[in-house]
């Protein structure tokens, strides 16, 4: 979709990179991709799948810096944050990255928590691509709240293709 809209990106954060499919695609027309994936199995696949110039981190991203645990979520490949544990979680703001063109967030319902930890970074971000499905309910949020949060942060919907929405700075 981004190629079709002639959007150009120099610096992208891929939060919830899974096995790197999206990072690989974006790396082909982007200057720098930084990918985050907390699941150890998915992270190993991510590292094997992406080119060397994609920066990878085995970290969860959320609303605070702490250690967490993940559990399997029902019968899917998705993981769920369940409390303290041995996986580091960081906020986007704590990464102290500037000039982000696009933040892509696909974290199986934890999207609102990621946004809460990215308030400062969002001020200088041009686009946010976010997967919005019914998983946000698992963490006490809903899709409308996520959209309102982004509107308040200065974004509007550029285009949507369920379950993804791309927001652009107003």
Predicted regions and their residues:
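Phosphate/nucleotide-binding beta-alpha loop and adjacent structural elements of enzyme active sites
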Residues: 1-170
């Amino acid at each position: 979709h981004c190629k079709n809209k002639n959007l150009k990106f120099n610096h992208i954060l891929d939060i919830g990179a899974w096995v790197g499919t999206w990072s690989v695609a974006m790396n082909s027309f982007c200057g720098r991709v930084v990918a985050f994936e907390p699941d150890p199995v998915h992270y190993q696949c991510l590292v094997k799948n992406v080119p060397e110039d994609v920066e990878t981190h085995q970290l969860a991203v959320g609303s605070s810096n702490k250690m967490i645990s993940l559990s399997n979520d029902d019968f899917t490949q998705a993981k769920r944050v369940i409390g303290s544990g041995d996986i580091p979680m960081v906020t986007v703001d704590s990464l102290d990255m500037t000039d982000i063109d696009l933040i892509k967030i696909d974290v199986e319902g934890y999207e609102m928590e990621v946004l809460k930890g990215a308030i400062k970074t969002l001020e200088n971000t041009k686009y946010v691509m976010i997967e919005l499905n019914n998983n946000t309910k698992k963490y006490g949020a809903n899709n409308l709240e996520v959209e309102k949060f982004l509107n308040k942060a200065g974004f509007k919907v550029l285009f949507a293709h369920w379950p993804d929405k791309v927001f652009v700075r107003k």
